[in-house]
Amino acid sequence: MDAWRMDPTFAMCEALVDGAELSSLAGGPFDVRAVVAGVRPETKDGFLLDEVPWTHFPQGDRVREAVHLLHTRDSPVSDGTGVVGGMCANDMRAAAALAVPFLIRIATDARHPHRADALAETSSPARAGHFGVASRKELLLHRGDTRYNDDYDDYGVEVTGYPAGWSVTAARAAITADTALLQPLLDDPDPIIRIDAAYALATATDRDHSVRTAFRTRLAAEQDPIVRAALVLATAEATRAHPHPATTTWVREQWRDRTQAPEVCLAAAIGWLCLTDGAAPNDLRATVDHLATDERAHVMEALPWMVFAGGSGETGLQRCVRTMLHPELPEPDDDPWALLL
């Protein structure tokens, strides 16, 4: 706590607690959205880390050091990406958002030994409030406006008092700025890279639908069922953020198509439920209840959406099915008879 009180951002957060208007700080040196937008392309490509004001944000010096070590390959991966992921898990994303452009460049370096780990962490600052979330309303929801919003949004504040929506918006803007670097990773030989590229790209602002088109293009060539499932979920997430009725209809066709792999049908069913608000049709219920076996639920843990949706002893798929289709059932920890079975 003493270290945090010495942090330059502490005065900003203290002022907010004391009643200062958030809008009065927008665009200033402690607005991570403005800082990310101001990072020069040459700074990103050349890893000129000293040009980035890391210390303007909580634990920024740790993030800068982690990016440096990861870039130079001088540390175990846990000392690099682990810092970014750990801070996001602890609800501190502002400095982590500054790392996003550099993590993307590490991920696109085919010779880097930790590129997969860097890519897996790229979207961590771009998501918040998603641990254990498996409802139709919230699973694929982008709670904040990706445009500048100088007031608090549904993300609220981080544990430091910093506006969480600013951090998320900054991270998504960084991903959006580098979609041209990320999209080729959808064709990477490594299926884990393809999955995590889709997961990261799904957070991008996609008003021209180019990202969604890239998902559909890759899907036409993709043979791996679990990667196909990832592409369907990514398409649904992008469509949730930028509605497109024709794509919603297409997602419905995927879970109705009996020639699709079970993982694809399940991903499409979940995605379609998140894109609509009517009662789940009987044929969808029957399809999901038939396909959502325990074995398949564990297979689908390869999808980051499912990893973060899980909780209370349930896999992500199990939690989604219960929450979306069987809300009358209690959570495992809330079932007083569970220990007797």
What are these regions (language model features)?
Residues 112, 119-182:
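Acidic, serine/threonine- and proline-enriched intrinsically disordered linkers and terminal tails
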Residues 60-68, 90-106, 131-139, 175-185, ...:
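Amphipathic alpha-helical scaffolding segments comprising HEAT/armadillo-like alpha-solenoid repeats
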Residues 73-76, 110-115, 189-191, 222-226, ...:
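Short inter-helical turns and helix N-cap capping residues of alpha-solenoid HEAT/ARM repeat scaffolds
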Residues 2-75:
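N-terminal "cap/leader" segments of large eukaryotic alpha-helical scaffolds
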Residues 243-341:
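Extended, charged low-complexity segments
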Residues 71-84, 150-160:
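HEAT-repeat alpha-solenoid elements in large eukaryotic scaffold proteins
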Residues 20, 24, 37, 46-58, ...:
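Structural detector for internal amphipathic alpha-helices that build alpha-solenoid repeat scaffolds
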